[in-house]
Amino acid sequence: MTSCIYNGTVIHKRFKPKIHFFKYRVFSLLIDLSELEKLDKTISFFSYNKFNLVSFFDKDHGDRDGSLLIDWVKKNLNQNNISSENIKIKLLCYPRIFGYVFNPLSVFYVYNNNNDLISILYEVKNTFGEQHTYVFKVKNENLLQHNCEKKFHVSPFIEMNCSYFFRILKPADKISVIIDQYQLNEKILYASQDGKRKDFTTSELIKSYLKHPLMTFKIIAAIHFEAFKLWTKGIKFIQKKLKIRNNISFEN
C-alpha cells in the first residue's frame, strides 16, 4: 500500500497589521483513495465510513454527500480539461478522531499512470461549514507553485482582497505545503504544514495518536483561541458577507 502517515507541525505567522505566531504538532494521513477499503479491513482502530478511534468519511470532502471522492475528483478534472484516465488520487488530510474532524486545508494529489503529478486540488474549509476548492493543472512537477485570487472567506481578521501563493513538495519521505497570502502586494500571512513519513500500519497509527491525542478537537479549539488572541490585539473583525456551501474554481 502507498497510503502513509505524516507526523509534523503546522505554523502560522501573521505580519500585518500586527505580528502573531503559533505552531502546533499534528499528524496527517496521505490516503490513496483506491486503498480505503483495504485499509478498513487491515488496520486496527481505523475505519472507512464507520466510527472508530481514527476514521475517514467520504462525506467530509468533495460534495460532502457521502458519494465516492474518486468520482468527484474525476468530474472536476474533466471539467478543467485534465485527463482522468488511469489516474491515482491521494488525499492529504486530518482523519476523524473519535468521530470528529475539522480540516482547514486538504490537498488532493492526482497522478497519471507514470506516477507524474498532473493536478492538485486545494480544498479549503472555514468554521462556518463552508468549502472552496481551487483546482490547478500541474505543468512541471519539479516546480509545484500556484497562485490565485482569494475567493473564499476563511479568517474573520483578513479581508477578501487578497491573493494566495502555494508552494508544495511532491509527497515522499517528507511533505511540505506552504501558503503565502498577499494583500496589495504585501505579504500578510505565512502558513505551512510539514511532516515526516511513516508507514500506515496499526502500530504507527497508534503511535501517532498517542503523540497527538484528541488532535482534531485541539485544532478547532486552537483556531478559536488564536482568534481570541487576535481580537485582544485589536485587529479588526471582518463580517462574512456571502453564504456558500461548496464552491469550486478552475485556476489554469
Predicted regions and their residues:
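Mature, function-bearing regions of proteins
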Residues: M1-N252
